[in-house]
């Protein structure tokens, strides 16, 4: 929830949590390997945005991996990142940047792959969640311990649809 007075008086605006946005972006980077995803992901890593909440971040990445992909990449294989070519950086990324800093593509690829490899070591319960999800059995309680989160996710439309 963000409160802003940009329109002359304070109003509340519901927003998606940054962790959820970056969990979805991490999955996008792993699967579609777009230049913008690599740039955003590495900025997140450089800012150490979730360094104090890595377990929750991993769980969010796992959740988004299950609801967004046709086939769950439960090993979090990052080889698609290698396919990002500098021509895509020039055509897709540079036009949306205010300043065209030197962009070390190979260094950024390596940084992203190492961060993901370090973070994405699912626990036994998290692996069980993914296996069951692939078998069309949705059990958010295997992924999250917090009852409030579990209850909010229990009726997640995309998860329910994918498990039909």
Question: Residue ranges of each PLM-predicted region?
Answer:
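Structured mid-to-C-terminal alpha-helical surface segments
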Residues: 1-164
